[in-house]
Amino acid sequence: MLNYKNLNELENFKILEGIAPEVLKTALTGKRIKEYDITIEGDSVHYNYASKQINETHLKIFQNLSDEANLIEKYKEVLDGEKINISENRKVLHHLTRGQIGKDVIEDNKENMREFFQSELEKIYNFAKQIHSGNIKSSNGKKFKNVVQIGIGGSSLGPKALYSSIKNYAKKHNLALMNGYFISNIDPDESEEVLSSINVDETLFIIVSKSGNTLETKANMQFLINKLKLNGIKEYKKQMVIITLKDSMLAIEEKGYLEYFFMHDSIGGRFSPTSAVGLTLLTLCFTEKVAKEILKGANEADKKSLNKNVKDNASLLAALISIYERNVLNYSSNCIIAYSKAMENFYLHLQQLEMESNGKSVNRFNETINYKTVRIIWGGIGTDVQHSFFQMLHQGTDIVPMDFIGFNETQLKEDVISDNSSSNDKLKANLIAQIIAFSKGKENSNKNKNFQGERPSALIYSKELTPYAIGAILSHYENKVMFEGFLLNINSFDQEGVQLGKIIANQILKNDNFKDEVIESYSKKILKKF
């Protein structure tokens, strides 16, 4: 395995610290917009960084920094099955769910992991065909019309983001065969809201838990079982699919469910949308064709991320820019704004992807580090956010870099002309206007009306939000997060930070440790049972 160094030990990072940001007011030109543009996957999904505060000097140092840190070589180690997740002694194999780029990866000296993931996909595709044809019906003999996925974190956020991104596209192309719903929160009101809004007789339920013992998912699964029984469905297991590890409690102890699809512990939840975790529901709702297009887009972007030239590798360049903005310019957050209603859930997935991966304060050697790591990821959809938090982005005291995402065409192809332009033209005009306004600003002697500009942004754009495009965009961000982790010398593939709260919650629920006056006082105020 290659050597890792802390970010502040890398010679080219020390050089980068002395480089001032580019002045966007004067730098942003038509020529720059044309030149500072690369494709994420090949030729249809673009990453434009013309409105980032960088120039050729930065790009040269980025290249040297990437080479010094062996970023592409480390990516190749991931693809070849090295145990990059050192704290858990695991490989990191989410790229294999959409195609093989590196060497054969053999687990436990016997199982080819690409073949394992492919066989699970084929099982999913065949199962979906049986559901769609009506060969498999509900326990009461009805054809399934709905799918509800029950899971939390990566078992919900990524799949939900992809589902909402593709739903209208599938509808327009007659590929929307079932309705999808999600239950994640342990709040029983969410379960009741979803289950009371559908006919459970016509609904297939997907239970996703890697360990088979996730607190929230177990509780929501029991809520579901109770609801099915109340609706006279005695053979409820015939309407439930399990997605879990082969050796989990759900797989070993819980028998008789309609079908089982298996995850692998080499893929963390936030990197699992292109595994059974995401593709089961997506195939059921939108067909095998859509699922394969998502995988194709992701795989093509994975390949492009192997390019050593930072000017031809969007995910690598985005990671280097992110490090510069966070660790040199001290920008503490990043805002994701998609000018597409279909992508309203996407920033929530990216929030988990980046903050759970790189929200660490120790390096790969379990040593405390003394530089900044992940930025706060947040966002929304345009143009809605222009009327909420854009005031702060334009004139607030914090500079917040932004990622804009936009598409030339709509998914449903319905529009209206108002004031001599279509709604979609207005949407795109607002996207372009915001990038320019944030970059160039506008001087005014009235300070209240002055726009300083110099607010950096990147633009991801394509002709249309298709399954292929969303697959490529998903891969772009996954690989960006991976490269950032390499530079920061942290393990992007564990999540110890989620454990402590779980332990204390279990203590409270079991009435343990009530010699702790803090637990007891909070519990008496909030939990009626105490």
Swiss-Prot record:
Q: Which GO terms describe its biological process?
A: gluconeogenesis; glucose 6-phosphate metabolic process; glycolytic process
| Keywords noted in UniProt | Cytoplasm, Gluconeogenesis, Glycolysis, Isomerase
Q: Which InterPro entries match?
A: G6P_Isomerase (IPR001672), G6P_Isomerase_C (IPR023096), Phosphoglucose_isomerase_CS (IPR018189), SIS_dom_sf (IPR046348), SIS_PGI_1 (IPR035476), SIS_PGI_2 (IPR035482)
Q: Name one GO molecular function term.
A: glucose-6-phosphate isomerase activity
According to the lineage, what is the superkingdom?
Bacteria
Major location (coarse) = cytoplasm
Pathway listed for it is: Carbohydrate biosynthesis; gluconeogenesis; Carbohydrate degradation; glycolysis; D-glyceraldehyde 3-phosphate and glycerone phosphate from D-glucose: step 2/4
Localisation per UniProt entry? Cytoplasm
What is the name attached to this protein's record?
Glucose-6-phosphate isomerase
Organism, as annotated: Borreliella burgdorferi (strain ATCC 35210 / DSM 4680 / CIP 102532 / B31) (Borrelia burgdorferi)
The gene from which this protein is expressed is pgi
